[in-house]
Amino acid sequence: MTSEISCFKAYDVRGRIPSELNQEIAFKIGAGVASHFSTKSVVVGYDVRPSSLDILDALARGIASHDSEVISIGLCGTEEIYFATNHLNTDAGVMITASHNPADYNGLKIVGSGAMPVSIDSGLGDIKSIAESVAYNPNIKPDIKDADIRDAYLDEILSFINVRNIKPMTIVVNSGNGCAGPVLSLIHI
């Protein structure tokens, strides 16, 4: 049975929790991602929203329903998912975030291998069609593997500058409610 999933937008998935995006829908989208990309592995990460861990659990079950490995980099920024998709050589990456939307929303940003962003015209529409036809199975138990990519990510960021050319200074950064704080606190130049 096909039922319309309304949280698909032009470049990502966003919806109010739980009416437009919930565990059942996240499961179906996870299955859609795994099916569309014929994945062997998918890297996932999430932001600080209260619903992110529930969405992660359901998304991982959906991905696992297609015998795909789920690799979590944990709490992170969207840019870290782009990096991890390349660095870990996964078939896809999914960031659980609703970006600037209100607190009662959450969403998913999806990239293919090589960290290629997916839009409604380049795969997101296909993922939506697959997700709408998937049967929800909350009993699947995903084997989520954790990966720490922070050191490699920092090395990549710092490779763009010559730190010897930077004069010593003190910089104060407030990442607000964003996820850049853990990365920024590791940078000591």
Residue spans of the language-model regions?
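An N-terminal, well-structured beta->alpha segment
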Residues: 1-61, 65-67, 146-169
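Residue-level signal for pocket-adjacent positions within structured domains
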Residues: 2-11, 103-106, 113, 122
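Active-site flanking residues adjacent to catalytic metal/cofactor-binding acidic residues
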Residues: 11, 46, 96, 173-176
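Conserved adenylation A10 loop of the ANL superfamily
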Residues: 12, 188-189
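Ferredoxin-reductase
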Residues: 37-113
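Gly/Ser/Thr-enriched, mixed-charge loops and adjacent short helices
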Residues: 106-187
